[in-house]
C-alpha cells in the first residue's frame, strides 16, 4: 500500500567539519522524530563513516536512512549520492576518498571531523580535510554512483555557491540527474521562474542541516511510496507506478490531495 513519507535527504553529522558538535546520531534521530521525518539522508562531505551509526539508531525509532554522502566535484559543485545499502556506499566512499587531496585537517580552523558510534562515543577523528573538491568531474561522480546502483542529485542548485547553476550556469547535457535539490527558501514555482531550464526535472528540498534547529524547515519533501527504500524513491522521482514526490509547506501535516509530480 502506498503512503506519504516525509523526508529530509541532506543532513550532516559531526564528521563534517562545518557541522556543529551537537550533530551526533542520537540528537539527529531525536530531532528527525520531533519533526515527523520518516526518511533521512545522511550526507557528510566526501565521507560516510557516521552513516552506519545513524542508520542503526534510526531503525530502532522506525526512521529509515538512505546511505549517502555529499561529494564536492572538481567543478566545486555539491552533489548528493545515495546507495542501496551500506556495502555499496562503502565501496564508492573509498573511491571518493582516493580522489580527495591529502591535505590535513586543521580543527582549530575548519572544525573537528568526529567519527562516532550509535551511542555517540567517539571512535576517532578523520585527519584528511573533507572540505576540498575531489579530483573527479560531475560526470565521473555520476557514473561511479550509477554503477553502484545509486541515486545522483545535485545539491541546493539555486544557491550562489557550490551549486550547479552558480558554477556552471546550466545543467550539462551529459548530466542526467535523478532529481535536483532546491533550498527551503524558495518554492518550486519560484525556482522554475528564476531558472526556466529546471522545468521538467523532479525537485526535492532538504534542510542541509549543520545544526539540530536546521531540521525544522519551512518546506518539506514528501514521497508517496510503498516503503522507505532507495528503489521506491527512484520510482517516486520518476513518477512511476503511482509513486510521486511533492514539496509542501511544513505547516501542512500531509500533502493529501496535492497534485503528484512537480
State where each predicted segment sits.
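Charged catalytic cores and adjacent phosphate/nucleic-acid-binding surfaces used
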Residues: 1-9, 17-31, 35-37, 48-91, ...
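Generic signal for short, ordered secondary-structure residues
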Residues: 10-11, 37, 120-124
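Ser/Thr-glycine-rich phosphate-binding loops at phosphate-binding pockets of nucleotides
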Residues: 13-14, 40-43
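Short coil/turn segments at secondary-structure boundaries
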Residues: 42-45, 129
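Active-site gating loops and adjacent loop-to-helix segments of metal-dependent hydrolytic enzymes
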Residues: 83-126, 170
